[in-house]
Curated annotation (Swiss-Prot):
Subunit field text: Monomer.
The organism's taxonomic lineage, starting at the top: Eukaryota, Viridiplantae, Streptophyta, Embryophyta, Tracheophyta
Stated name of the protein: Anaerobic nitrite reductase Glb1-2
Catalytically driven reaction(s): Fe(III)-heme b-[protein] + nitric oxide + H2O = Fe(II)-heme b-[protein] + nitrite + 2 H(+)
Pfam family for this entry, one: Globin
Family: Belongs to the plant globin family.
Gene from which the chain derives: Glb1-2
GO cellular component annotations of the record: cytoplasm; nucleus
Source species: Medicago truncatula
Record's function text: Phytoglobin that regulates the fine tuning of nitric oxide (NO) concentration in the cytosol in response to sudden changes in O(2) availability, and performs both symbiotic and nonsymbiotic functions. Exhibits NO dioxygenase activity in the presence of O(2) but nitrite reductase (NiR) activity in the absence of O(2) (e.g. during flooding or in waterlogged soil). May not function as an oxygen storage or transport protein.
Amino acid sequence: MEENKKTVDGSVDFTEEQEALVVKSWNAMKNNSCDLSLKFFTKILEIAPPAKQMFSFLKDSNVPLEQNPKLKPHAMSVFLMTCESAVQLRKAGKVRVRESNLKKLGATHFKTGVQDEHFEVTKQALLETIEEAIPEMWSLAMKNAWAEAHDQLANAIKVEMKEAHDQMDNANLIINMEENTGSCFTEEQEALVVKSWNAIKYNSGDLSLKFFKKILEIAPPAKQLFSFLKDSNVPLEHNPKLKPHAMSVFLMTCESAVQLRKAGKVTVRESNLKKLGATHFKTGVKDEHFEVTKQALLETIKEALPEMWSPAMENAWGEAHDQLANAIKAEMKKTDHDHQTNVEDKSKPSS
């Protein structure tokens, strides 16, 4: 997508000469905007007949185009929005379409499958309509001015289309993560996890510390992710916050594994899961950090019960860990989306 042409201060680069040409031509034809709207829309369908399928009021209609009761209001809406945003472009320094309308336009265009080439069709139809309406006034400079104004509006809509696309991707990713949680954990895996947990849970205090130390042995920089460690000069084993934190993480991981199949999902209280997602997002946790915790977990359990350990048990605990990790990632994704929305809202200039 081409970026809007902008000046250093962020405003749209639409020249005074271009503005004068657009305003002059719009003043000459706006009293005839009703007929011109219909011509404009008819031209779109002449240039690209398949575009008819993109309009809900046309695609399943057997009524002749000129008799369709919804055609005129829609054509007027599109033509007037395009022309009026062009007239105000330089003065406003941006495309002047109400923000809620722009978001709706983006979502609708994305949903109906509008592509870059469709915007080129509307531009061609717009330029031909204006040229035929005021042939004595038409010039290459005027054509370029209207084309630039059209492209600015098109790019503003494309930005909102991308936002709609990203929101759908985020929603689908979260849904997939949530739907898959617990769905791939077999009865055999459950039995292995329960059996091994029953054998080690009474030693969970020591194992928690071993588990946490392994995380820092495998990935020493991970120390910076923990607020009680990153600025501490106290030896690890003397840190008063280490054991409670290690116990909390280890017990949550193991107990959610034991309950995974029966519950059909990760059984961590929803408020805790949201908090985990927010904290992991804030501290910059990445996928590779979850791989570190998995390795540390598997090594800790293997060393705790070597006589019981097997590839099947390793896979069972690995799967249980991944289910918990995915549940946390889903919450991280939600937090990220909320954060991006807040940043965008704050960065938008007030009207």
